[in-house]
Amino acid sequence: MFSIEFGLTFAILFFKGHREAQERLEPLMTKIDFKKTQKALYLPSAKTIELIDVPPMQYAMIDGKGPPGNDTYIATLGWLYPVSYGIKFRSKLELKQDYVVPPLEGLWWAEDYSAYTSDRRDEWLWTMMIRVPDWIDQTIFDACVTKAAIKLGNSPATLRLETLHEGQCAQIMHIGPYKDEGPTIAKIHNQFIPDHGLIENGLHHEIYIGDPRKTAPEKLRTVLRQPVRERETA
């Protein structure tokens, strides 16, 4: 549903030289890839909606409003990627723990749900975020924000390090263009959740797997996740 090409390009250009230098320094360091160590969170079935227990995880987050691709959205990605790569490099150099920067994720909602069904994108609300390993503390996060600000200027007011605990969730992998997610999302909300005696318990969550600049639209992979809880009975 949502474009992330600008943010990816910005991050690559911003940190290309730094990244190459650091990789030469520690060529034998083990690199953790959460997509491989926690496959259930990032690579669910594309055929069947599943229930999964999602543990608490911390993220670099920024809030915004409006259609993806507007100035606020582009500026958000222009901050999230540099800060996230800055954290990765500091973790590698100072803590001797290397990892693959996790994929971009987004929480999406609207004060009036019909804003989605009628495609009133100016009313869309969102939080874009990138996972930060649990061994990273606020001090390191703040230092990376300060460093990014040298080139980017004042940081967004909502840029923060925050823990998200979704708990039980329904999720499935959507394969195809972002704009074609609608029927799958509807199936989660209108069929799977009520059929299992559940109700929504959080915001619609998307995880964008892979690089949309290098992937044909029909092969794009997006995790569609909805926190749920048991429906109370009288």
Q: Where are the regions that the model predicts?
A:
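Short, Lys/Arg-enriched N-terminal segments with co-localized hydrophobic residues
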Residues: 9, 14-28
